[in-house]
Regions:
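A general alpha-helix detector
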Residues: 9-13, 29, 47, 71
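Short, Lys/Arg-enriched anionic-surface-contact patches
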Residues: 25-44
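General nucleic-acid-binding
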Residues: 1-18
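C-terminal structural segments of small proteins and small subunits
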Residues: 14, 69-95
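Short alpha-helical "recognition helix" segments of helix-turn-helix
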Residues: 60-65, 72
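Short, amphipathic alpha-helical "recognition" segments used to contact nucleic acids or chromatin
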Residues: 42-56
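Active-site anion-handling motifs in enzyme catalytic cores
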Residues: 20-21, 27, 100
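Long, compositionally biased
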Residues: 53-60, 92-96, 100
Length: 100
């Protein structure tokens, strides 16, 4: 999958993301580059992935997030068959929470 998105434009975009210094800069950047619905949709998918990671059922996830079962299924495929980035991020978030 990574090879399908790897190109100069994506490299520049990712470099731009990595150059942002804090959450406020991320908010400002995404406010400029995306519509509200695009950001909310991405955030919803991330929430679905986290809930799948926690072992929640499709029904519970759908009720809590409003995501369709088709969206949950697509996210589940990414979580289980993807590059492992979700697990890496969830571990980091959980460690950050423990360190508080």
């Amino acid at each position: 999958m990574i090879s399908k998105i790897r190109n100069e434009n994506v490299e520049l975009f990712f470099d731009a993301l990595l150059s942002l210094k804090d959450k406020e800069e991320l908010y400002a950047f995404f406010d400029d580059i995306c519509t509200t619905n695009e950001v909310l949709s991405i955030a919803q998918r991330f929430e679905v992935a986290y809930m799948l990671h926690e072992g929640k059922t499709y029904n519970d996830i759908s009720k809590e997030t409003g995501a369709s079962t088709a969206t949950i299924s697509r996210v589940n495929r990414s979580v289980s068959d993807g590059n492992g980035s979700y697990d890496m991020i969830f571990e980091r978030l959980e460690k950050k929470e423990e360190d508080k």
